[in-house]
Regions:
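Glycine- and aromatic-enriched mobile tails/lids
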Residues: 1-162
């Protein structure tokens, strides 16, 4: 029952907001922040900036988003507002996760963590785990849980693409 009340209050806030900025504007701005700061190549400075930028964008979203239409009935803009609100939280959490993982591995390259030859530098001694983040309200308050990865049939080793 409490969850239903929270969702209804959130939807009513979107409709009654009287903001002046379309949902799509926030969606595009979030995409730009993620593309520029949390892509395949990333660094501590850009990730830290992205977290601050997304947090500010999220605050602006709730203050200024315009959602036309009614609360009940077909309203694709209301649906979109809910999705973008979720994406703002997810984007901030993705940046937080990328900032916490101080290694280069797989498809993501931390510029601070590379070999002398410019290859991705793994840190298997510290990062052989799956990250699972527990929601605690705000993305900045999410709690990291680590699930250890155990390899039985392969050997972990530094890759080289040369």
């Amino acid at each position: 029952m409490e969850a239903e009340k929270e969702v209804k209050a959130r939807l009513e806030a979107f409709i009654g907001n009287n903001g002046d900025t379309p949902v799509d504007d926030f969606h595009r701005r979030l995409g730009r922040i993620m593309w520029e700061n949390c892509g395949m190549a990333r660094n501590k400075e850009d990730l830290t900036q992205a977290i601050a930028d997304i947090s500010a964008l999220r605050a602006e979203f709730y203050a200024k988003v315009r959602v036309p239409g009614r609360l009940y009935g077909y309203n694709p803009e209301l649906d979109k507002a809910g999705r973008v609100a979720d994406l703002l939280e997810l984007g901030e959490l993705m940046c937080k996760d990328a900032l916490e993982r101080e290694e280069s591995c797989g498809g993501h390259f931390r510029e601070e963590h590379q070999t002398e030859e410019g290859e991705a530098l793994r840190r298997d001694d510290e990062f052989t785990f799956v990250s699972a983040w527990q929601h605690k309200g705000e993305p900045k308050d999410a709690e990291l849980h680590k699930e250890a990865l155990v390899y039985e049939n392969i050997e972990l080793k530094q890759r080289s693409y040369k």
